[in-house]
Amino acid sequence: MSERLTFNKTVKNIVNKIQNSGAEAALYMIHAYVEPHENTNPQMIKDIKKMYIDAGNENNALVIPVGIAFENSYSENPDIKLHKHYDGSHPNLLGTYLAACVVFASITQISPKKVEYSYFNKINNEDKAYLQKIAHETVENFYDINL
């Protein structure tokens, strides 16, 4: 069975359980791998976007565009580091903060620019403002809304 088919069946099963309980389902769109991950592939984010958007549409589930935010951030600022340097898979503190801002804005439809939290001041004001801007723009563009 293909990875995509397995993903679609799993999403359908889990989303049905969630919706049958009276709750709303959301799909957290993952980000693509980066170097040094052995499976780094420039096409990966396109495949991820299609897979999550299709699954969200087919199952009436909210798609939270974290992967797109990572892509947008790397496109705008290729020098930023959002992944752990040793594996290229897991987000570092900045990547985690960006993801949290996207989740916040997607669920609340409130701009993450209004979030004051910076992980106990571990994220400097410049990075915080940049990541909030990326999250804000990504969510607005993905859902075609104004935050």
Regions found by a protein language model. Name each.
Residues 1-93, 105:
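Alpha-helical cap/lid subdomain in secreted, periplasmic
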Residues 90, 100-147:
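Conserved catalytic region of serine esterases and O-acyltransferases that act on ester linkages
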Residues 95-97:
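Extracytoplasmic ligand-binding site segments that recognize negatively charged/polar headgroups
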